[in-house]
């Protein structure tokens, strides 16, 4: 049942020319690299993984109307900075798939919110990798 929900909600991934993954902080940055690699291996869609802070240094130019952006935003000290990165992507017409354990204002910028359970920030990659694998 959860697979059907993922496929229906994340339909912007079908036919995408590229997919951009963003995360802030050491753990989230490494996690988006793994997610991008898995998606490229399975779907043969070009995927790019970037730390959210480096978005303005090139990757933002690749975002056009309908480009899927998968963002990981755990509840940690980087959450407000991640919200800023998501807002920039949304302003350029990206379809935002947000993976977060936060229920606050950051979710209003997402087209799809995949809610994960709250956990210690150092353990969040173990929880957040599951939705990335299901995508």
Each model region followed by its residue ranges:
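A SIS-like phosphosugar-recognition module
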Residues: 1-134
